[in-house]
Amino acid sequence: MKTAVWAACLLLLASALPPAADAARRPHRVARHAAHQPVQPAAAPQPLHVTIMDGDSGAILHCEDCNAPMPPASMSKLMTALIVGDALLQHRITLDTRYHVSENAWRHGAMSDGSHMFLELNSEVSIRDLIQGVIVVSANDACIVLAEGLAGSESAFVALMNRRAQELGLRSAHFTNATGLPDPNHVISSADLARLARYLVANHPELYRLYGERAFTYNGHTQENRNPLLGTVAGADGLKTGHTDDSGFGLVGSAVQNGHRRILVFNGLRSMADRREAGINLMRAAFEQYATQRIARRGQQLGEAQVYLGSRATAPLVAQNDIVVGGPQAVLAGLRTHVVYAGPLRAPIAQGQVVAQLVVEGPGLQTKRFPLVSGQRIGGANWFAKAWEGLRVTFSGAH
């Protein structure tokens, strides 16, 4: 991993950290991408698909292969929970609504070797218990019961998951089940997982508080939340772990410090201990080494563009949205900006029409481009102005 990110990771715990119970009970196979790396026991764990996001603005602070689709394992249960949260907000269900535990949900969830909440066949379970099972202990049986109860079948529920992903602009996402169990077509990028987590924080506070619960008891069984950040990183309050043989050990984590939220996503580690170590050190680095810089607020004018044959000679260029750039603190100190457009612009121009870009660049920063829109409607010139412009062009080009 890049030196800037792992500077904090070299200060490791002196003694071995006790692993928490994890979902899978099969021996773990090393992720394919890590198989060719030399074994260096003293080195810090090297996760794959790393995203560090500023949770307030959504700016990506650090990206390592963060846009590549990856197998998310149980981290995709964030979307499962979101679909349930949407139904609650729309008053289609309540927390007291009860769903039937079918043989399919029992056999493929409660009787599987993955995480489950010990649901009993043919029992009736409240959505309150089911959603806690999904969020706190990653229960596969609860996922299937919720999918069948809400949509009639897991496949119909998956269609809702994929439709919601499209609505949220999660372009890398494609889901094939409600649980995250292995499937080569069940993928999402770490950057899109971070965006999904940020959406949950902002729009489903009633569910989000469950992600910080340390344990859940159902049917006489108490299970602990596997999130290694809870209780170890100041301000940590979510979200979700994941593990399969194909994905390795991954984490979507979030924490708030000094009023600022950071969201962390990574995958591909070889053990729970590695996930714990990487999660703690990366989240600390997220607050200590990274920052954001606001370039402009939505609607702020950043320049003007020349207009050809318009009712006025220039168009005001304003920010379409808030413009925030994130990255290592040292990099942000050297930012440069400039406006680019293909001009002069040709009238008529609608107010809010994208007509230019603000380019942000600097040493060590990948160039970023943000849309600028016309702050005014600009009509076409009248016939006299057009005729005069025609004469001007004709005679200026005659010599």
Language model features with spans:
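C-terminal segment of classical bacterial N-terminal signal peptides
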Residues: L13-A20
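Active-site-adjacent loops and short helices of periplasmic peptidoglycan-processing enzymes
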Residues: A24-A194, R198-N203
